[in-house]
């Protein structure tokens, strides 16, 4: 009995050790040069599943654990909320423009899910938030284990100006589940959201991603699909120069993804 107990205990220790070994994160300090090239401060997490064992690399690991407003990256789960709640039927559902002139030209027209995702059309998602309500939004967020799961706000949109916050590491967790259709929503809705996220596609790979910006900090999150597996990424940077800094999000992330052959060179 004692021998059996010790054998079981040893097996448990080995399994735990292996689990920790698989979860080990590599600090890629050399990626700092890509941030320096653009005079930017931020973090990026890259999870490469093209090999037998997952490879997780991060630049600025402490920041990767810090939570920030998700801004428009929240359109990824928010679209799932809206589909589940019946606030939108499908990608062909048209939302009529109210005629109010907004700062982004792409917002000043009728929208559907595809254009709203592509143009980051805030007013469409404001309609969703109003119909879903705070209590149901909180329930969805808790079910997803999304960041701090707090949709409260004193003013403005809770995913931009409110209390909702998520880290780069947590963004990766959500993206990985979405890739595998493992989020607690209908599979067909998850597949639709992934289709809406397509930014670029070639014969061998597909880039699915979403930007975000709250005025002070910018995101670019998503993944690149290869025949051998996906490469997930989540980047955020400070944007002290506001809109002048926005191009840096994709530029830095693309350079890093190219450095690990997750995207082809320009």
From Swiss-Prot:
Q: Which GO terms describe its biological process?
A: antibiotic catabolic process; response to antibiotic
Positions carrying N6-carboxylysine are 75
**Residues that coordinate or bind substrate:** 210-212
EC no.?
3.5.2.6
GO MF, one example: penicillin binding
**Active-site residue list:** 72 (acyl-ester intermediate)
Question: How might one describe the regulation of this protein's activity?
Answer: Inhibited by clavulanic acid.
List the catalytic activities from the record: a beta-lactam + H2O = a substituted beta-amino acid
Q: So which residues are the signal peptide here?
A: 1-21
What are the UniProt keywords, alphabetically? Antibiotic resistance, Hydrolase, Signal
Q: Does the keyword Translocase apply?
A: no
The family database entries (Pfam families) matched by this protein are listed as:
Transpeptidase (PF00905)
Briefly, what is this protein's role?
This is an oxacillin-hydrolyzing beta-lactamase.
NCBIfam families the record matches: bla_class_D_main
Q: What is the protein named?
A: Beta-lactamase OXA-20
Organism (species): Pseudomonas aeruginosa
């Amino acid at each position: 009995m004692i021998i059996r107990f010790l054998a079981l205990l040893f097996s448990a220790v080995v399994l735990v050790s292996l689990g920790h070994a698989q979860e080990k994160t590599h600090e890629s300090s050399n990626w700092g040069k890509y941030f320096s090239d653009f005079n930017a401060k931020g973090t990026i997490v890259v999870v490469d599943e093209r090999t037998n064992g997952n490879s997780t690399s991060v630049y600025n690991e402490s920041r990767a654990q810090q939570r920030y407003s998700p801004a428009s990256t929240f359109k990824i789960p928010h679209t799932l909320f809206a589909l589940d709640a019946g606030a939108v039927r499908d990608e062909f559902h048209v939302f009529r423009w109210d005629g109010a002139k907004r700062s982004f030209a792409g917002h000043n027209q009728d929208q559907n899910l595809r254009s709203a995702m592509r143009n980051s059309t805030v007013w469409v998602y404001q309609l969703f938030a109003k119909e879903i309500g705070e209590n149901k939004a909180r329930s969805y967020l808790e079910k997803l284990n999304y960041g701090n799961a707090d949709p409260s706000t004193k003013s403005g949109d809770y995913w931009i100006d409110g209390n909702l916050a998520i880290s780069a590491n947590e963004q990766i967790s959500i993206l990985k589940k979405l890739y595998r259709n493992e989020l607690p929503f209908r599979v067909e809705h998850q597949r639709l959201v992934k289709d809406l996220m397509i930014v670029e596609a070639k014969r061998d790979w597909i880039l699915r991603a979403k930007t975000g910006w709250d005025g002070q900090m910018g995101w670019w999150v998503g993944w690149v699909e290869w025949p051998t597996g996906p490469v997930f990424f989540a980047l955020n940077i400070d944007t002290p120069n506001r809109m002048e800094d926005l191009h840096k999000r994709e530029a830095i992330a693309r350079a890093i993804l190219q450095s690990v052959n997750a995207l082809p060179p320009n």
